[in-house]
Amino acid sequence: MNSIVNFSQQLIQNFQEVSQKTVADSSNLKAFAYLGAGLAMIGVIGVGAGQGYAAGKACDAIARNPEAQKQVFRVLVIGTAISETSSIYALLVALILIFVG
């Protein structure tokens, strides 16, 4: 049990030393903020591909059954709005990292 406590104390001490060195260099901090913003925007790729696929399938469904156009369109709009929220959150995270970080 004592070795676990010593390990955790050493881990905390090492983390504090590293974080103090990193915060002292603001150019590294800004570079990491830009890197994080870029990584946050990777999530938008999947949303765009998914929305394109859904729109294509909706066009196929309307072509096969034109009478169901209103129902297919309603489901498409709701599904697109729900899937778009994740890309909006990714954009907000990226903007916060760039301008606040």
Swiss-Prot record:
Bilayer disposition of the protein: Multi-pass membrane protein
Superkingdom to which the source organism belongs: Bacteria
Molecular function in Gene Ontology: lipid binding; proton-transporting ATP synthase activity, rotational mechanism
Site (Reversibly protonated during proton transport): 84
Chief location: membrane
TM ranges: 31-51, 81-101
Keyword Transport: yes
InterPro entries: ATP_synth_csu_bac/chlpt, ATP_synth_F0_csu, ATP_synth_F0_csu_DDCD_BS, ATPase_proteolipid_c-like_dom, F/V-ATP_Csub_sf
Gene Ontology cellular-component annotations: plasma membrane; proton-transporting ATP synthase complex; proton-transporting two-sector ATPase complex, proton-transporting domain
Subcellular location: Cell membrane
NCBIfam families: ATP_synt_c, PRK07159.1
Subunit details: F-type ATPases have 2 components, F(1) - the catalytic core - and F(0) - the membrane proton channel. F(1) has five subunits: alpha(3), beta(3), gamma(1), delta(1), epsilon(1). F(0) has three main subunits: a(1), b(2) and c(10-14). The alpha and beta chains form an alternating ring which encloses part of the gamma chain. F(1) is attached to F(0) by a central stalk formed by the gamma and epsilon chains, while a peripheral stalk is formed by the delta and b chains.
The protein's role, per its UniProt record: F(1)F(0) ATP synthase produces ATP from ADP in the presence of a proton or sodium gradient. F-type ATPases consist of two structural domains, F(1) containing the extramembraneous catalytic core and F(0) containing the membrane proton channel, linked together by a central stalk and a peripheral stalk. During catalysis, ATP synthesis in the catalytic domain of F(1) is coupled via a rotary mechanism of the central stalk subunits to proton translocation. Key component of the F(0) channel; it plays a direct role in translocation across the membrane. A homomeric c-ring of between 10-14 subunits forms the central stalk rotor element with the F(1) delta and epsilon subunits.
PANTHER family associated with the record: ATP SYNTHASE LIPID-BINDING PROTEIN, MITOCHONDRIAL, ATPASE PROTEIN 9
Protein's name in the database: ATP synthase subunit c
Source organism of the structure: Mesomycoplasma hyopneumoniae (strain 7448)
Gene encoding the protein: atpE
